[in-house]
Amino acid sequence: MGETRHFFLTGCASGIAKHLTGVLLGQGHSVFATDVNLEALENAAREGAWPVERVRLRALDVRDADAWENVFAEAVREFGHIDICMNIAGLLLAAWATDQPINEVHSQIDVNVKGVIFGTRVAARHMVLRGKGHIINIASIAGLTPVPGMAVYAATKYAVRAYSISACMELRKKGVYVTAICPASVQTPMLDGQLHNDAADLFYSGYRMLTVDEIEHAIFKRAMRRRPPYEVHVPRLKTKLAKFVDNFPAVGPIFAPLYQWSGRRRQAQRRAEEQRAK
């Protein structure tokens, strides 16, 4: 990625953001790493031997707009400026449309949508003043196609994608770019938490899960270009099918049973592996 840069990341205690934090620090960059769970974030830093001179660890509840203002301002004071902000923190709680508890509706919308909007808003204001910067928002394949069993989650990821592309249209002329990353299922603790949830079967479909290394490649090689794209789909073939179903939703019920069968089979295999490991 050339010269060293200053990054601001959310959700760094686990999953994609934890992996990216370690990679960025290994490349010599500085990272302002945040998570709602500071203790888990500190544990991740110790486990990864993150260099204290180039990383700052702070608690951040992405649902709190005032917290965003304060923590991002601290990051600017610490590093002088932020080159790239990655809104990665997310929440997946699968449930059938008739059964999703109200608190889960609120929590997914608050974390996945409001968290990204608050973060993009704060980072964009800082970057516009500098005349340059890049904001990367993690959406999902669920932002490209309807997903039975995850109606609320899919709605939040559609919102993240639409917001990111709309904001990019506004900001590009000011030197600031926004890119939405839309991956298929990624093997992370967030997805592991849905292993025993039958409503999440579609997210376990397909011949394999993406790895955090593949998301790293998509971000570093495809998103972080001199002129960043509006969105990046990972992998290309599966997301093309998702876009097709989005354009022609009536074909969804034709494909869905096959993918649900595949997902349930994979869930059963993973559950059996979990039992054997105990």
Q: Across the structure, where does each feature detected by a protein language model lie?
A:
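Canonical Rossmann dinucleotide-binding motif of NAD(H)/NADP(H)-dependent dehydrogenases/reductases
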Residues: 2-32
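The beta1-alpha1 cofactor-binding region of Rossmann-like NAD(H)/NADP(H)-dependent oxidoreductases
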Residues: 59-70, 102
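Conserved glycine-rich Rossmann-like NAD(P)H-binding loop of the short-chain dehydrogenase/reductase
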Residues: 27-43
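Active-site helix of classical SDR
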Residues: 120, 156
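Residue(s) in the substrate-gating loop at a strand-loop-helix junction
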Residues: 140
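Substrate-binding pocket helix/loop in short-chain dehydrogenase/reductase
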Residues: 96-97, 101-109
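SDR active-site lid
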Residues: 172-236
